Amino acid sequence: MDLKAKLREVPDFPKEGINFIDITTVLQDPEALKECIDSMKKKVESFGEFDIIVGAESRGFIFGAPLAYALGKGFVPIRKKGKLPYKTISVEYELEYGTDILEMHIDAIKKGQRVVIVDDLLATGGTTKSNIKLVEQLGGEILGIVYFVELTFLNGREKLKGYNVESIVQY
């Protein structure tokens, strides 16, 4: 199945000049969603033995939790500041206009655990770099990173040099 053909491109969203890649068309199609998860699962399995999957709010949850289930692993959510109920570690990262803070529970990753990060889209790599910092602060080892969509023209892989990065659909 051509998953790229199943995606919808929305011009000038969220602002003029941006060509937004809408994943909801894949999520709504049971066969496309299954193909997407199965394809991501193969990429994750190619990294070798690992312990846990991490996904960032919110679309990382969409792919990370079903992958964790399919692979018999746990799932760790990374959330925006103030959304997790227990003690957290945090990292500030830059957005196009300003900064934001991501958090993870202090007991979410055990020292030495092998971690796979899952997200919907690789653009500049900034959010993923923040995820990596959180995992590594707790002593986790990043085994690999899997995205559904990669915007290659934004060169996000450059920020992630030294990490095993895979994607299903490339623009």
Curated annotation (Swiss-Prot):
Supply the Pfam families for this chain.
Pribosyltran
**What are the transmembrane regions?**
none
Please tell me whether the keyword Transferase is annotated for this protein: yes
Location in the cell reads: Cytoplasm
Cell wall biogenesis/degradation is among the record's keywords: no
Report which reactions are catalysed by this protein: AMP + diphosphate = 5-phospho-alpha-D-ribose 1-diphosphate + adenine
GO MF terms on file?
A: adenine binding; adenine phosphoribosyltransferase activity; AMP binding
Fetch the InterPro entries from UniProt: Ade_phspho_trans, PRibTrfase_dom, PRTase-like, UPRTase/APRTase
Pathway in which the depicted protein is active: Purine metabolism; AMP biosynthesis via salvage pathway; AMP from adenine: step 1/1
Name the Gene3D superfamilies on file: 3.40.50.2020
Group of enzyme by EC: transferase
Question: Quick one: a GO cellular component term?
Answer: cytoplasm
- UniProt superkingdom: Bacteria
What EC number(s) has UniProt assigned to this enzyme? 2.4.2.7
User: Major location, coarse class?
Assistant: cytoplasm
* UniProt keywords, alphabetically: Cytoplasm, Glycosyltransferase, Purine salvage, Transferase
Q: Name one GO biological process term.
A: purine ribonucleoside salvage
Which protein family is named in the record?
Belongs to the purine/pyrimidine phosphoribosyltransferase family.
Function description = Catalyzes a salvage reaction resulting in the formation of AMP, that is energically less costly than de novo synthesis.
Q: How does it assemble?
A: Homodimer.
Q: What is this protein called?
A: Adenine phosphoribosyltransferase
Organism of origin:
Acetivibrio thermocellus (strain ATCC 27405 / DSM 1237 / JCM 9322 / NBRC 103400 / NCIMB 10682 / NRRL B-4536 / VPI 7372) (Clostridium thermocellum)
* Biological classification of the source: Bacteria, Bacillati, Bacillota, Clostridia, Eubacteriales
Q: Gene for this protein?
A: apt
